[in-house]
Amino acid sequence: MKDIASDLNLSKMTISRVLRGQTDVSAATKARVLQRMKELNYRPNVAARNLRSGSTFTIGLIVPSLATPFFAEVAKGLVETLRTAGYGLLISSAEENSETEQFEVGFQLSRQVDALLIASVQESAEFFNDLARQKKPLIMIDRKPPLFSAHFVGVRDRDIGYVAAAHLIKKGCRRVAYLRGPRTAAADLRYSGYRAALNDFNVTFRPDLVVESSETSHLEYKRGADAMRRLLREKVRLDGVMCYSDLLAVGVIDAALEKNLNVPGDLAVVGCGNLLPVQHLRVPLSSVDLVGLEVGQRAARLALRLLSSEKVAPYQQLNLPPRIVIRQSSQSGAE
């Protein structure tokens, strides 16, 4: 550290602040220090640093599933931002199971993470109250638990449903089906956004156009295809389909093409996620982008602020707007 300070004509205190991830160092100075560290292959003594500071310089992240592309994007945004501040990321998966999540929370706390970020599968208020008593910075990611106040970073699921349905209606669709996801709060909120868009654009709600889909898994594609085949078999009239996920939407499109329907001429389709290689499909898929990378970046910056001496207003609510990426499956000149 002394050599780096001398080489850059900076004080050892400034170098130390960069290593600790403090925010009162200019971006230019931080970049110079990190570049010189790289050139010298400098590795700080983590154990000594942790003992001095009482910090592990590790942030914990618990997600419902590591198989979900959205959470991979969130983790990427976190890692990129935390790395520049000298922090690492410890990731755990709850596998969409509340008991597994409780185990992972205990594991992360036993590792003395400095802050905990969690996209929780829990519905118990007691669980969240126990978390709050740990006196560690806590940020909820993507999923906002009811009846519990905490910092939150994510996209409003209701907005996701609204944006997708509104796009199809603006394209001219009047009989818009909705393929629901699992019975979760997020799925219910997307459904409420779908209903709100129908109402705002004076489109009649038809219960027969709402199709339940069992829990998300590697079988999502099959569930989407099966649901579409059933709608066609029952001769349900529809001209647009909004899907809870991209995988469901891909299944819908393939089932429609089997019956020689034109997508988007006969049937417009929109998914949610924009994380699969949907632009390379037979019919490139329109999808609502959940901005996972930005969610991760914003959550990391909030965590660092909470860990610094900076004053942060209680229970920050960072609701990021979703955006729709329009491709061939719902191509429209209206947007």
Language model: regions and residue ranges:
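N-terminal helix-turn-helix DNA-binding module of bacterial transcription factors
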Residues: 1-57, 334-335
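Alpha-helical recognition/docking segments in bacterial nutrient-uptake
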Residues: 54-166, 170, 233, 237
